[in-house]
Swiss-Prot record:
This is tRNA dimethylallyltransferase. It catalyses: adenosine(37) in tRNA + dimethylallyl diphosphate = N(6)-dimethylallyladenosine(37) in tRNA + diphosphate. Monomer. GO terms for biological process: tRNA modification. The record marks S108, R129 as: Interaction with substrate tRNA. Disulfide bonds: none annotated. Pfam families: IPPT (PF01715). Its cofactor is Mg(2+). ATP binds at G17, P18, T19, G20, S21, G22, K23, S24. Belongs to the IPP transferase family. It comes from Paenarthrobacter aurescens (strain TC1). The gene is miaA.
């Protein structure tokens, strides 16, 4: 009897790191080198029309590489990590079924974890949530926090604001399980590898400032005006995006464009620091220098080593 040797499944490749570090370019270069396709894991790049303010990769910059989950939502829609998980894993399966490499690119840490790791998303109970919100409004947060300490002390110690405490109690009421039991574990859902872009923090700070000024010069305010006309303000996710929230205030006469630009720079730098903290906590990531002239070659070697 003869047996056919089965090839091990190809790992999903994830390119991660802070905003402005060059993830999109590396993703395209890896796709060209490895016969792959890119899946977007930047929550704000899901939105059609949010191009300048998200530094969305252009059609020309994609260099013929197929990109999935870009421009897949209207600005009025709310982004959902659970929905993304389903859509991303479907895209991964589709890409792999055609013999291609799936390359996940993005800096939205929870979205990357949702795609790669074993991670459950509990449902919602609008009626229970409304009851909890009314209780919080009438009696304050303290009684709800005390209740959470009884059923889920881990979450009670970690969650500070009313919205998250209410969500934790909602999940417990819905599932009978503590909210903390749904937190992501560092266990891959399927074979995967992560490549992180190591940055010089001072250089990144300067790059982010230059990038925001270029966005403004490139028409960010006009982009916000166009999106405002199609419902940007009603979108819970899109309306809070860096740059967009600030320039909505410009449209309302609450601040000048110069002030909006400076506030966007500060907020973007803070966001980049949070991204670095998130990704640095994951020991599975292989870090490569963002400005290394041999970056692509080294990244390909990391992938090939993990695939043998």
């Amino acid at each position: 009897m003869s047996f056919t040797r089965q090839e091990p499944p190809r790992p999903v490749i994830a390119v991660v790191g802070p905003t402005g570090s060059g993830k999109s370019d590396l993703g395209v270069n890896l796709a060209l080198a490895l016969d792959g396709e890119v899946i977007n894991a930047d929550a704000l790049q899901f939105y059609r029309g949010m191009d300048i303010g998200t530094a969305k990769i252009t059609v020309e910059e994609r260099r013929g590489v197929p990109h999935h989950l870009l421009d897949s939502m209207d600005v009025t829609q709310e982004a959902s990590v659970a929905d993304f998980q389903d859509e991303c894993r479907a895209a991964i399966n589709d890409i792999h079924s055609r013999g291609k490499r799936a390359i996940l690119v993005g800096g939205s840490g929870l979205y990357v974890r949702a795609a790669l790791d074993v991670l459950e998303f509990p449902g919602t109970d609008p009626t229970l949530r409304k009851e909890l919100e009314e209780e919080c409004e009438n009696n304050g947060l303290a009684p709800l926090r005390a209740r959470l300490e009884e059923v889920d002390p881990v979450s009670a110690a970690r969650l500070g604001d009313a919205r998250r405490v209410i969500r934790a109690l909602e999940v417990h009421g819905l599932t009978g399980r503590p909210f903390s039991s749904f937190m992501p574990q560092r266990e891959y859902f399927q074979p995967a590898l992560q490549i992180g872009l190591e940055v010089d923090r001072e250089q990144l700070r300067e790059r982010l400032a230059v990038r925001v000024h270029r966005m403004v010069e490139g028409g960010l305010q006009q982009e916000v005006e166009r999106l405002d006309a199609v419902g940007l303000r009603s979108g819970k996710t899109a309306s809070r995006a860096l740059g967009y929230a600030q320039f909505l205030k410009v449209l309302d006469g609450e601040m000048t464009a110069d002030t909006a630009a400076e506030e966007t720079i500060v907020a973007t730098r803070q966001f980049a620091r949070r991204q670095l903290t998130w990704f640095r906590a994951d020991p599975r990531i292989t870090w490569l220098g963002w400005q290394d002239p041999e970056l692509v070659d080294k990244a390909v070697k990391v992938v090939n080593a993990a695939s043998t």
